[in-house]
Amino acid sequence: MSVAVRGVLRRAVDVFRDEPEIAKLLHQQLDRLDEPLRVAIAGKVKAGKSTLLNALVGEDIAPTDAGECTRVVTWYQDGRTPKVVMYPRSGPPTSLPVHRRDGALAIDLQGTAPEQLDRLVVDWPSQSLRTATLIDTPGIASASTEIARRTWAFLAPEDDSLTEADAVIYLMRHLHSADAQFLESFQDQTVARASSVNTIAVLSRADEVGGGRVDGMFSAKAIARRYQAEPTLRSLCQTVIPVAGLLALTGRTLRQAEFAALKKLAHSPREHADAMLLSVDHFLAPDHSAGSSDSETPTSQNALSREIRHSLLERFGLFGIRLSTTLIRQGTDTPSGLAAELVRRSGMNELAEVLHTLFTQRSDLLKARSALRALEHVLSSSTNAATKDLGGDVERILGGAHELTELRLLSAMRSDEVDLPRAEHAEAERLLGGSGVAPAVRLSLSADANPAQLQQAALEALGRWQRHAENPLFSRVAAEACRAVVRSCEGMLTNLPRE
């Protein structure tokens, strides 16, 4: 499909060669096909967007305070050297100094008001950013309507212009009407209309769901499953993943001194440590220092200063401190071991796997979809007589690209527009690539399945869905869906390796 999209874009560039602005836009779409996927991170204020971005990258590069930078749409992309450039709404871009404060990247707008900026672009050498450019957006439903408007304007513009994001990670702490409204507005696009396959929802700050209890993530997972089963949300996003972003970030950036402090706390008398961890106030109280041989009279040698305790709270949160001390008592005795366990329990590994399966593996398709959407937008507003043939080319791509048929059908199925029986409905979603595009995933086989096993499973699925397509009891809509699944099975059989 990407080859066909490149071809029609090149023809469009030639058609609009005398219209510089449009030609420039089309050239940008061609370049975009060779760039990393653009993934926006959105959500309400204090949902943990910047913290999650930092956790995904594994470094403190996105400001997490309520400073001026969090009021600007900020792009983070892979680069050879660190660089920060601000793009004003009018005037040339300006490079900003790159410096760190307390280990985190600090961005100084040098007196420029956030309202005057279109965006910030941060180049940062990062393996994580080579497959996806991450876009941090201001919080929606902000007390400042101007701040919230920027995210709406970027991801769901009202003037019929196009979003620059290929996909979205949407963070929510609870499911509110504002969340559903935002997701609906982002999905309302022309190509593969209302396709939920480019959106993932994250139940953010999941460690706070259980009141900071060590088992709080279990409660968060149950809530995420319940949200995922709700028809409204199911029609708007692929899945819902609970993630404790702060825990993940701290796990990926754990310091030796922090481990030493946690170990000291874990090995202090249990009653004393439990009393400290009752609440934030207890943990920061002047008479609560860890590591004494006597719970009331801690020794100066083993005491944790208030400064250290405050730093631990900022980095781990109360949940992270409770979990870390529990893990250390249970035998996690190295910084690397604790770091790995914190990341594992944060939900970040599950999110990374979902991002790889649903976004990275589908990146060429999602980028091609964005390019077609841009071309459709140009053609719909053009008076150039030569665009008629281009419109026909786009229609042929849309009609012949089974990958887009899969996207549209997956969206329709998640909106309960396809009346298949429950078991067949679930299998159809999987065979269409709803859980990932790899043949083993589509066929519900293990990742190490050999070609013969894949071939056999695909043949069985093909025969099964050919029978479903001829079932006289199925509605016309269901029968059309079955035929699309048949085509997906045929495509797998064509592309599977032979032994």
Where does each model-flagged region fall?
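Charged, amphipathic alpha-helical linker segments immediately N-terminal to NTP-binding catalytic cores
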Residues: 1-17
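Short, flexible helix-adjacent loops and helix caps
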Residues: 14, 61, 211, 363, ...
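Charged, low-complexity interaction regions
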Residues: 17-21, 384
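Cytosolic juxtamembrane amphipathic/interface segments immediately preceding
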Residues: 25-29
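Globular "head" domains of long coiled-coil molecular machines
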Residues: 30, 34-275, 345
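Active-site-adjacent bridging/hinge elements
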Residues: 48, 322-330, 434-435, 460-466
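C-terminal end of P-loop GTPase domains and the immediately downstream helical coupling element
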Residues: 200, 206-402, 406
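N-terminal J-domain/J-like co-chaperone modules of DnaJ/Hsp40 proteins
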Residues: 404-499
